[in-house]
Regions:
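N-terminal amphipathic, basic-rich helices that act as targeting or association modules
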Residues: 24, 40, 160-161, 168
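A short, polar/proline- and glycine-enriched secondary-structure boundary/capping micro-motif
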Residues: 41, 50, 61, 151-153, ...
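Aromatic (tryptophan-biased) beta-strands that constitute blades/sheets of beta-rich domains
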Residues: 1-16, 46-55, 101-121, 167-174, ...
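Beta-propeller blade signature
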Residues: 95, 99-100, 154-167
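Repeat-blade elements of multi-bladed beta-propeller folds
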Residues: 14-34, 61-91, 124-150, 157, ...
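Short, ordered coil/turn segments that flank beta-strands lining enzyme active or ligand-binding pockets
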Residues: 43, 88-90, 97-98, 108, ...
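Solvent-exposed loop/turn segments at secondary-structure junctions
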Residues: 35-36, 56-57, 90-91, 113, ...
Length: 199
């Protein structure tokens, strides 16, 4: 075992993999605990490209990525073949499936900030580990919110976004009733301390 400092501060043991790769054409796509995304030739096993997230590791107690999702945008859309990947600093990135570069026009600089309208919390309280679902023209995202640490934890809201632009479309906030609501605007915050999907 590594010393406590290496375990808790340097994250030297964060090398386990929980990702299930997806197979699109002749390529496997997967992600690493440090939110790197890789495209691998399905025949030779050689790496085609790697996107390396630059988010700082410090302050995050649980580093894991469980997978990525694939989406084909309408013809004529920039970056038409997309890989959506969660990051441990609560972002959802859209990458060009052919090059690994961030998709322009999606969110801000190719990413959406999932901490929007969630209120203030330690970074480790809200992270994204699971791939989103792309269904009926919606990018649907749930998150892992740490449990049993505080009474005022981030919301367990499930949100849907436009998979081309990254614009929010609807939100299912357990504290607002059984039906989806319009995305929040301004300084409003989704109901804190609600159940989450551990995604």
């Amino acid at each position: 075992d590594l010393p406590d400092y290496a375990e808790k501060v340097e994250h030297k043991r964060e090398y386990h993999s929980e990702a299930t790769p997806i197979h699109i054409g002749d390529t496997l796509y997967t992600c690493t605990p440090h939110s790197w995304v890789e495209a691998i030739d399905a025949t030779t096993g050689k790496t085609k490209w790697v996107w390396k997230d630059q988010a700082p590791l410090k302050g995050n107690s649980y580093l894991v990525c469980r997978g990525v999702s694939y989406f084909e945008a309408p013809a004529g859309t920039p970056c038409p073949r997309r890989i959506f990947a969660p990051t441990f600093d609560a972002r959802m990135v859209a990458l060009d499936a052919d090059t690994g570069k961030l998709c322009p026009g999606f969110g801000t600089g190719g990413a959406i900030n999932l901490r929007d309208h969630m209120g203030a919390s330690p970074r480790a309280y809200q992270i994204s580990t699971s791939p989103p679902i792309v269904a009926n023209g919606r990018l649907i995202v749930g998150e892992r919110v740490i449990d049993n640490e505080a009474h005022d934890e981030p919301s367990g809201v499930v949100r849907a976004y436009d998979p081309v632009t990254g614009a929010p479309i609807w939100a299912w906030d357990p504290g607002s009733g059984p039906d989806a609501i319009a995305p929040l605007t301004g300084d409003r915050i989704y109901t804190r301390g609600t159940p989450n999907v551990w995604g």
